[in-house]
């Protein structure tokens, strides 16, 4: 079972905010309009409250009913403008935030496709998926609910304190002291909450990864009767998640009650002192009336902010994890040699063409063309998935154009590693791998892989029709080409027997097909690409003997003129290879044809006669 690596602690919140602002900057005019509407909304509330002073002093106390009605109507118009502005920025914020989050999600997916395989080796699928779901959703929710509210809260608080200073400096000192106490508590509580929210997200990633693995491995789980054991494991993980969630919510839940209590006490003290000021003639009745409303308004922005703290914390944590993944180094590609289509001239020269001729050449940076023939060589190659643990130890081998090379050996001998290195899924630590005399490090990875096709034992099919899955090897393939490729792989017969034939929809990973049928489709997908080099990584180990013979006959057609690498569990699949390489502990210990190796009576002979089992 894959081990959850875990989220890293936030390294630089400022960097995360700066990165987020880069995306917001793409919609600066929309956010500018939102800011203007927020300013109008906050300003309307502040100025509407200030009208209480003249209304009380000039109309209520003197008993001026006509003036009171006009003043109240003016206040109503001002509040209506504020309400319309609030409605406007909320609608605009929803539309804009959706665009921002959609752009982040697209960039994240695009970057994910460029990450090296070792990243996926070290991170569970559940953890990676949580970046696209949980983390992106928290950013979106915070933008919808918190962005405009935080700005409005700041403007309202700033404007309120300013107007309070205008009305009474001495009373405002009392309010500011309470606001400072509230701010200190919010900062302390936020720091503690953020730590627990981080742990909560880590535990959620654990659960996601575990559940995904269990769903993918249902058959294995049932065969070995691990249901109860896995349930107990899930209960442990669920309990850890519950504890961290409880701690996070406990701290965040303290905010509102404490802030509300402080605001009530602040209001009572301000009312008491303000009443004394009115009795002594220091303030008039209108001023204290407006002032007490401002006291309540000064607490509202902080209350609103505390309600959004949870969203802000989750959004920052989610954004940090998203941008951490986006900051992961992309798969390196320093290659400048490209692959191009060519025309073979009568005088044995070659010419580049934009037409798809089925003939290829390597185009060097200087413009020189080297015909692609499929000559692959390893020279003293050293490699290990972990640098200090070698998998291949100064291995040297070669495959001449058109040869079929087979690899046999026990688990961990390095068979699959060799084909991984041919594809440059990983880079070697020393030595060289050449392709038609060109170091593969100098070939652009996209072009290198375009010259290869690979069929692996754990066949992966995509949701879609059978035709779509075969066409994956050549996106512009015609229906006739698809059918021809299926015939080569001997898949046409079972496909045509299906009710909808080539238009049959496949469920997740081709679950409605047998293992053998899935492999036949994978072979058809490779056949339609017509690659110069073909890699069969244990491609026929799960297919019955009869189907295997049909595949071997069909594969002869696409192998002609191509270099083919084969890894198989069955020695019968490699007998007709030009060369068989026996691998042991990352080294080639025997090389030769089937008959030559039998004559040597070495490890291959022992495997063939059953003295050792072939893995």
Label each residue range with its predicted role.
Residues 1-45, 60-71, 89-93, 97, ...:
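Membrane-integrated ABC transporters
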Residues 16, 24, 89, 93-97, ...:
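Juxtamembrane loop-to-helix connectors within ABC transporter transmembrane domains
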Residues 18-21, 29-50, 54, 71, ...:
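Alpha-helical segments in transporter systems
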Residues 26, 30-43, 74-84, 145-199, ...:
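Transmembrane helices of ABC transporter permease
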Residues 61-66, 70-71, 163-177, 247-320, ...:
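Helix-loop-helix
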Residues 108, 112, 221, 322, ...:
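Helix-loop junctions and hydrophobic alpha-helical segments within the transmembrane domains
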Residues 117-118, 134-143, 147, 151, ...:
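An intracellular "coupling" helix at the cytosolic face of ABC transporter transmembrane type-1 domains
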Residues 340-615:
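ABC-type nucleotide-binding domain
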